[in-house]
């Protein structure tokens, strides 16, 4: 059996926090994704993002048309034990460039 080799080196912690605030009697709730790491962990995460961004999906025979390349980052193996599992991937689909249906673009002003 081949030993798992993480693309993340150093220390990287990715957590979700739930926040709540009351303003003028109105309760507001929101979530935040927090990404923290030591220099080595942050740099290896950056390299992973650049690798995904530069990847030519159309050249991947094993990736079906319409699919999106992605990588799973798992607590204990890639991330700290306190982290949530994270999937980092391309928004654009192979062959079509289409974004998935749930995507809502940010507003440009």
Task: Label each residue range with its predicted role.
Residues 1-109:
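Positively charged, low-complexity terminal tracts
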């Amino acid at each position: 059996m081949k030993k798992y080799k993480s693309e993340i080196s150093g220390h990287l912690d990715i957590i979700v926090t739930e926040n709540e605030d009351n303003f003028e009697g109105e309760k507001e709730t929101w979530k935040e994704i927090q990404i923290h790491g030591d220099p080595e962990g942050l740099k290896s995460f950056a390299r992973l993002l650049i690798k995904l961004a530069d990847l030519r999906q159309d050249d991947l025979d094993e990736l079906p048309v319409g699919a999106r390349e992605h990588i799973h980052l798992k607590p204990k193996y890639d991330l700290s034990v306190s982290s949530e599992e994270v999937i980092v991937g391309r928004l654009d689909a192979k062959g079509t460039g289409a974004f998935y249906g749930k995507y809502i673009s940010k507003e440009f002003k």
